[in-house]
């Protein structure tokens, strides 16, 4: 399964091109900007929600709403975004992460709208962002945060995407996999720094990835460990290393009740 990321990015470019033909950027931007102060759509403060949980002594859990993945196939047959989001909210999640990629993760924009609409938690649009158009899409769908993957973006475009998100009131989670990507991530303004324990080019997973990068992390960054958190021992290992923010999907999606599994994992 070599270089999955390149395949995904090629499809993303085609998706954006097709979306622009259906709706022009000025129209989409106007809608996104108009929602900033509208009841129910105003940004909910993704970073703030994480920090509040951690300040209260809890883990800051970004709980994922994900039907499938390229490496594991369908994770949850009984996939009801509203029920999943409600369960997460009632069992201690700080935020949601909702997959909107259709072709590789069987996600959808409607899943983001439905999950966010069913609970008070802020939501991340989990997708492969390659164009400003997608940032405006994210806000028009209600997203409170976007994901920027260093491996997928050149530094100039990444900075532009971040600036656009911040102008719209959204937070930004920047994601790295290795030390070679850290410098680019640290040039951004966002304090939210995700470390993906899964290599997006091979889909191999190692929790050592987060631990190995910790010594290089500035103190003002909030480190989010992503992927491979499957049991309480994984959580303990990270929290013992002073990592208190987690993005977890598969372990929750495979459980009978995702929120109950969240509470068990982070008890």
Swiss-Prot record:
One of its GO terms (biological process) is L-tryptophan biosynthetic process. One of its GO terms (molecular function) is indole-3-glycerol-phosphate synthase activity. The keyword Amino-acid biosynthesis applies. Its EC number is 4.1.1.48. Pathway: Amino-acid biosynthesis; L-tryptophan biosynthesis; L-tryptophan from chorismate: step 4/5. It catalyses: 1-(2-carboxyphenylamino)-1-deoxy-D-ribulose 5-phosphate + H(+) = (1S,2R)-1-C-(indol-3-yl)glycerol 3-phosphate + CO2 + H2O. Keywords: Amino-acid biosynthesis, Aromatic amino acid biosynthesis, Decarboxylase, Lyase, Tryptophan biosynthesis. It comes from the Bacteria. SUPFAM superfamilies: Ribulose-phoshate binding barrel. Pfam families: IGPS (PF00218). Belongs to the TrpC family. This is Indole-3-glycerol phosphate synthase.
